């Protein structure tokens, strides 16, 4: 049973994310509304900006909501954007159930708090896994969804072994050492050269990540089931954005499942690895806008 948040705290700020240009938002008088809900006595923070049809952008592993900064700036004039920090990331606390299903319940509570009937949900990487769990349980609240460098397949045994090694590294060396080592591999060789400063800044922003959260995410990813049935059965539009140089969610895996939905849209970012919102920002923005406008 989902518990509705009993307490909600509101604060208004020009922006609290390092990646945002605060002056830009003040100049445009576009203020981000920060909200904190209590989900089973744990604080969950999310941000609202803009008006229009609601769109939730769900970040992935080793990130927080600020990873969507360029997309927020691009889409905020046309849509009501909802940007959560998932449990354990950013300024949201870990919850008791850190499974994909447990974190999907948090997203549902945010939708409930916003009094939204239906919204579009776009999930990056692990955020896509959470999105699929949300659609599985609350399909009536999601009118379209997108998998941005994400997959409906369960982990292979090989992938599980890689995650287990990652867990051991995190326990021995800490979260930031792990992220400093692993995050550069998410970018294509071209991106590492062309946006090196942005990648360095992004990694620096992860310094305070919780090792317990990262371990919980890896454990949840290893346990998540195959959800290709969601793709097969949905009547709603589904967006796939894949990176040609993505080692985390290989292009071949995406191509094997993008035909499953009745209404499927597939876009390949030719110069991206796993971080297309940063690597090919303009193209990623255009893809999202086209999907949101025409779904």
Residue ranges and their predicted role:
Residues 265-295:
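Catalytic active-site module of serine/aspartate enzymes centered on a nucleophile-bearing elbow/loop
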Residues 1-54, 76-79, 112, 116-117, ...:
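Alpha/beta-hydrolase fold catalytic core
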Residues 117-156:
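Conserved hydrolase catalytic core segment
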Residues 233-272, 278:
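Conserved loop-alpha-helix segment in the C-terminal half of the alpha/beta-hydrolase fold
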Residues 60-70, 81:
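Serine-hydrolase catalytic-loop signature spanning alpha/beta hydrolases and amidase-signature enzymes
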Residues 47, 70-73, 82-122, 137, ...:
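Active-site loop/oxyanion-hole signature of alpha/beta-hydrolase fold enzymes
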Residues 154-161, 173-233:
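Conserved alpha/beta-hydrolase catalytic His-Asp/Glu region
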Residues 58-60, 242:
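The conserved beta1-alpha1 loop
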């Amino acid at each position: 049973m989902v518990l509705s948040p009993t307490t909600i705290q509101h604060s208004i700020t020009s922006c609290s994310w390092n990646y945002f240009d605060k002056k830009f938002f003040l100049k445009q008088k576009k203020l981000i509304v920060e909200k904190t809900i209590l989900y089973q006595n744990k604080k969950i923070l999310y941000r609202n900006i803009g008006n229009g049809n609601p769109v939730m952008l769900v970040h992935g592993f080793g990130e927080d909501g600020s990873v969507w900064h360029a997309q927020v700036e691009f889409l905020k004039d046309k849509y009501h954007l909802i940007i959560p920090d998932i449990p354990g990331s950013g300024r949201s606390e870990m919850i008791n159930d850190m499974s994909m299903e447990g974190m999907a319940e948090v997203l549902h509570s945010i939708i409930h708090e916003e009094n939204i009937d239906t919204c579009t949900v776009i999930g990056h990487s692990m955020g896509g896994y959470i999105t699929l769990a949300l659609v599985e349980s609350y399909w009536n609240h999601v009118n379209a969804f997108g998998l941005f460098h994400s997959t409906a397949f369960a982990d292979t045994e090989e992938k599980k072994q890689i995650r287990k090694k990652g867990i051991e590294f995190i326990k021995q060396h800490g979260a930031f050492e792990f992220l400093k080592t692993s995050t550069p591999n998410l970018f294509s060789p071209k991106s590492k050269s062309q946006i090196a400063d942005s990648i360095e800044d992004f990694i620096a922003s992860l310094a305070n990540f919780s090792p317990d959260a990262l371990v919980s995410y890896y454990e949840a990813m290893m346990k998540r089931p195959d959800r290709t049935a969601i793709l097969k059965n949905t009547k709603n539009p589904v967006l796939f954005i894949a990176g040609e140089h993505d080692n985390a969610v290989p292009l071949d895996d995406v191509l094997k499942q993008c035909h499953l939905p009745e209404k499927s849209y597939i876009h390949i970012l030719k110069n991206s690895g796993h971080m297309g919102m940063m690597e090919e920002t303009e193209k990623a923005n255009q893809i999202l806008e086209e999907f949101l406008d025409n779904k």
